[in-house]
Amino acid sequence: CALVAGETAEHPGVLGTEDFDVAGAATGIVDAPRLLGPQRVCAGDLVVGFASSGLHSNGYSLVRRIVTDARVDWDSSIPQSYGVAAPSGSPFAEAADYTLGLACLEPTRLYSKLCLELEDSGWLAARQAGDFAGELDGNRVHAFAHVTGGGLAANLCRVIPAGLHAVVDRATWQVPGIFRYLMDLGGVDVTSAEDTWNLGVGMVAIVHPDFVPATMMAAQVAGMESFVMGRVSDGVPAGERQISGTKGVAGGTVAMLGEYRF
């Protein structure tokens, strides 16, 4: 059989004209009644974010351009005023100096184990609450959004159904210092940064309000910071930026409001 879809890696400025990239993709199988996605998301759901470990694997074309234009060495120290430090579990935690290069090489945090545990416990919670009769709300966890290329809003709106919107408050989490340093170093405005980097949020779960405490406890046990960052609503979205229709998905809208805490 043919497995449609996969991953196309883009490496501008890295691969030469005669170089090539080998990429792999895995396709999973799930029982239809347990499939998560926008079909489960409804007004009143809460948006919970899980902290990233840094840049993850996106936005490096902009990073390289900033560093090149600023003529900064990868081995240079980041000013202490930015508060940049190796995150929990970092392979560079014992480094004498957490340099710009090490901060940019920080491995991408994996959320697969946490997400699978939440899906299982959300399913069990729905059964215990008597919500297991074929309704869409057969799981307290309704959708996940992995924040990759394009930033938070562009990835989150892919799991918001048409007619609904997620209002995200930028002030609900602390943006890691590496992003502010790169923004200052390259003169990058908030909108450009928001559309390129994860700005501290690597994964998002959309859950039933009753399941928020269990979601945040699971993240804590996994050693990850989590925060309630927004709510799914109907009606007219509020917020100075409204993003929809990204990455070929015609769904709902993400409205970004407030100011980031740097």
Locate the predicted segments by residue.
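Glycine-rich anion-binding loops of enzyme active sites
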Residues: 1-61, 231-233
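N-terminal hydrophobic or amphipathic segments with adjacent small-residue motifs
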Residues: 7, 22, 31, 38, ...
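Glycine-/charge-enriched secondary-structure boundary and capping motifs
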Residues: 15-20, 84-103, 109-262
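Short, surface-exposed linear patches
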Residues: 25-27, 45-48, 69-72, 165-168, ...
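Phosphate-handling active-site elements
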Residues: 34-37, 73-75, 166-169, 215
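Acidic, glycine-rich loop-and-beta core segments that form the ion-binding/anion-interacting portion
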Residues: 41-104
